[in-house]
Curated annotation (Swiss-Prot):
This is N-(5'-phosphoribosyl)anthranilate isomerase. Gene3D superfamilies: Aldolase class I (3.20.20.70). One of its GO terms (biological process) is L-tryptophan biosynthetic process. Its EC number is 5.3.1.24. It holds the Pfam family PRAI. Keywords: Amino-acid biosynthesis, Aromatic amino acid biosynthesis, Isomerase, Tryptophan biosynthesis. One of its GO terms (molecular function) is phosphoribosylanthranilate isomerase activity. Pathway: Amino-acid biosynthesis; L-tryptophan biosynthesis; L-tryptophan from chorismate: step 3/5.
Length: 204
């Protein structure tokens, strides 16, 4: 099981997450309490192992701005967390992830229409797109087509207490956590380590 730790804002947390076994680190460039500057993201990315994916999260941003930030920071993927459509996705020259809030089984059909490398299934959006710490009914994704499952990233309220059930139900390619590894709004290294270990153990 691949694991992405999202909403990273400092070098130490990013490096520790990688040492614990994180496969991807997420940087939020959209409005959020975890928003990061281009300069800081570039500094952190420059100190991470080459094999770790560096993913930038954007919400309804222009293709030009996304591409500029991706190029300057050294992102390997961009995550589109707003209302982006295929005509915008096609203009990107970097691998992409499209986020989709899940409210019914029909969202799986909607997901298959996106021309992206991965689909991230999340809880429905609220004030901020993602990072709300709320789960959705994983059973809605239980009967996912095999080809879609191979490119599925599961997010939305995941934590050390529910990750086993989430993985068992959805069987995604990757799991994505942010608020679930925080204490009082800040990333907690102990929780990050526990989450990564549990995710990889329960998917064996």
């Amino acid at each position: 099981m691949k694991v992405k730790i999202c909403g990273i804002t400092d070098v130490e947390t990013a490096k520790c997450a990688c040492e614990y076994g994180a496969d991807a680190i997420g940087f939020v460039f959209a409005e959020s309490k975890r928003k990061i500057t281009l300069g800081l993201a570039k500094e952190i990315i420059g100190k991470l192992p080459a094999h770790v994916l560096k993913i930038g999260v954007f919400v309804n941003e222009s293709v030009e701005v996304i591409q500029k930030i991706a190029d300057e920071c050294g992102l390997t993927h961009v995550q589109l967390h707003g209302d982006e459509e295929n005509h915008q996705i096609r203009r990107l020259n970097i691998p992409s992830i499209k986020s989709l809030g899940v409210t019914s089984e029909s969202d799986m059909k909607s997901a298959q229409a996106y021309e992206t490398d991965y689909i991230l299934f999340d809880s429905p959006k609220e004030k901020f797109h993602g990072g709300n710490g709320k789960t959705f009914s994983w059973e809605l994704l239980e009967h996912m087509p095999k080809e879609l499952r191979k490119k599925t990233i599961l997010a939305g309220g995941l934590n050390i207490l529910n990750i086993e059930e989430a993985i068992r139900t959805v069987r995604p390619y990757m799991v994505d956590v942010s608020s679930g590894v925080e204490t009082e709004g800040k990333k907690d290294l102990k929780k990050i380590k526990q989450f990564i270990i549990k995710s990889k153990e329960c998917s064996k």
